[in-house]
Amino acid sequence: MKGEVKKVVLAYSGGLDTSIILRWLQDQYQCEVVTFTADLGQGEELEPARAKARLMGIKEENIFIDDLREEFVRDFVFPMFRANALYEGVYLLGTSIARPLISKRQIEIANMVGADAVSHGATGKGNDQVRFEMGYYALKPDIKVIAPWRLWDLTSRTKLLDFAEKHQIPIAKDKRGEAPYSTDANLLHISYEGKALEDPWVEPFEDMYTRSVAPENAPDKPTYIEIEFEKGDAVAIDGVRLSPAALLTKLNELGGANGIGRLDLVENRFVGMKSRGVYETPGGSVLIVAHRAMESLTLDRGESHLKDELMPRYAELIYNGFWFAPERIAIQTMIDKVSENVSGTVRLKLFKGVASVVGRKSPKSLYRMDYVTFEEDSVYDQRDAQGFIKLNALRMRLAKMARG
C-alpha cells in the first residue's frame, strides 16, 4: 500500500477506533495524515482529540477541529424539517443528516491541504460507509477513499485492543469493560445500538438515556411554549429569537425535561439487513409537531398532500446517503418554494412524553372563520355542494350502471 496515497484526511473523533485507524493509515500507507474533528453538538470536549492527534505525530497544521453546529442546523436539519422527513414513518434521521456535512467538510479540507484521499471509521456492515462515500464522490469524483474496516484484519474488539497496546495508543480505562451499547450523538439526537440492544426483545436500560427523563417521571405540571416560524424554519421560542443551533438546544432542554423524544425501532438498512436502534430526539420531536401544525394553517391542500406524497422518498434519499443527489435537490427546491408561506406561531403543551398543539396563528393563514362557522354566514352558499357532489359521484354512478 506504500506509495498509493500521499496525504489523507481522516474523519477523527479522538476515540479508540479512529485513533487505531490513524496509526494503521500511517503504518500501511506511510502517508501524511490530516485529522478532522467536527463539533456537531455531540456534547463532548473535543480538545482531547487535538492532544491525542499531536501525541500520534500529527502536525499542528494538519489538525482541524471545526465548530459546525450552526451550519449543521441551518443548512441540513432545518431544510430536512421543512419536509417533515421521517424514515419508515418514525425515524427523524438524526445520524443520517449529519453525514453529508462531515463529508462536505472533509472534501473542503482535502482541497485546502492538497490531499488525494479521505478516510472514515464506519464499518462494512452499516449505512454510514455509504453515506460518507456518496458525499465524497458527489463532491470530488476523483477522490480516493480508504475504508479500513473493509480492508484490515482487526476483526474483533480483542484484536483492536491488542493493536492499540502494541502501538502505545492510549486506552481509556472503561474500554475493557465498555458500555453494553454504542452511541452516536449530535445536536439533533443521540442513538444507542449494538451489543445488549441487538436483541429486539430486550428493553433499553433506563440509565442509558442521557437527554430525556422517563415520561412517567416527567413533571406533573405541563409546560407551555410558543414557537415562531418564518418561511418554514423555527426562529423564536416564547418571543425570544435564537440562532438555529441555540433554538434546537433550547428545544432539546424543554422536550427532554418533559420526557419527549424517545424512540425504539427496528429499521431497514440500505445495505440489506435490519437493525435495532434506540434514539433520543427531544427537540426534533417537538419541532416536527409544531411545523406540521404551522403547515396545516398556511398550506393549500394540494401543496400539503404533494409534500406528504414526496416525503417518504425524500426521507429515504437522506437515509441512504443521497443528500447531494439531483433528485433530493429537486424535491428540496419544491419544498423550499412551498415553505415561503409557512410563517406564524404555534403554541404547544409539553406533558409526560407528548407534545400537543393547543394553538396556532399566522398572518398567512388560509383558515377562514367566516367560511367554516356553523352559524349563519353570507359567504358560502350550501346549495353549491349539490352539483359538486353529483359531479364527483358521476364516475361511480356510471360504473355501477355498467357493471351492476
Curated annotation (Swiss-Prot):
One of the GO biological process terms: L-arginine biosynthetic process
Single GO MF descriptor: ATP binding
Cellular localization per UniProt: Cytoplasm
Binding site for L-aspartate: T123, N127, D128
Top EC class, one word: ligase
The protein's Enzyme Commission number: 6.3.4.5
Record: residues binding ATP: A11, Y12, S13, G14, G15, L16, D17, T18, S19, A38, G121
Signal peptide feature range: none
Known pathway: Amino-acid biosynthesis; L-arginine biosynthesis; L-arginine from L-ornithine and carbamoyl phosphate: step 2/3
Catalytic reaction annotation: L-citrulline + L-aspartate + ATP = 2-(N(omega)-L-arginino)succinate + AMP + diphosphate + H(+)
Residues binding L-citrulline, per UniProt: Y91, S96, N127, R131, S182, S191, E267, Y279
UniProt KW keywords: Amino-acid biosynthesis, Arginine biosynthesis, ATP-binding, Cytoplasm, Ligase, Nucleotide-binding
Statement: the UniProt record of this protein carries the keyword ATP-binding: yes
GO CC entries: cytoplasm
Family the entry assigns: Belongs to the argininosuccinate synthase family. Type 1 subfamily.
PANTHER family: ARGININOSUCCINATE SYNTHASE (PTHR11587:SF2)
Quaternary structure note: Homotetramer.
Protein's recorded name: Argininosuccinate synthase
Species of the source: Paramagnetospirillum magneticum (strain ATCC 700264 / AMB-1)
Gene: argG
